[in-house]
Amino acid sequence: MRSTFLFLLIALMAACSPGSPDATDGNDNPTDTIEDDVVETIYDPAVSWAACGSGEGDHPCNIIATDHNGDEFDLYANYGSLVVLDLSTMWCGPCNSAGAHAQEVQDLYADQDLIYVTVLIENREAMPPTEADIQQWVSDYGNTTSPVLAGTRGMLVSSGGTWELTSWPTFFYIDREMVIRDVDKGYSATEVLYSIEWLLAL
């Protein structure tokens, strides 16, 4: 029984490493085939602060994109609010578990002016998510006021971006001064609530 549990745990961890199957061709080159309806994401690392990054104590780099409702989302426009930023993929099991609770968490802390944002970096085929992918995620998990955005691997440090990830999902807890206060790798419903309560107490 113990060996079966250990095998499943290792398999789950491997499934959600930052690399993904089918994301490269035989020459280890990204297969950047883009579907016609891929959602264009504007990723703007230019900021009004001296520098931005993805570590604790950093101002995050801005993310500007169209959310699942067709509204523009601008991370910096949420200055003064608390932000839970969840970088996920559609093919990752724990990411789906997190997605199933995103709206619930958003509703739970709505009175504290908290926003829970999901950025999907890849779809189930390890490709940039399309509008149809975003809408499928929203349909599956009931997002209404909790924004779901399409991202790309270009956002990640491994691809020349500024968001450092070593596992899926990765959560960034951002305070009212737009400073990253905590970074959590992987998903635990209890840990998400604990980190939010800690953020509220700052």
Model regions and ranges:
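Ser/Thr-rich, Pro/Gly/Ala-heavy low-complexity intrinsically disordered linkers and tails
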Residues: M13-A46
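Short, internal strand/loop/helix patches
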Residues: V117, A132-T170
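Short pre-active-site segment immediately N-terminal to redox-active cysteine/selenocysteine motifs
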Residues: S81-V83, S88-W91, N123, S167
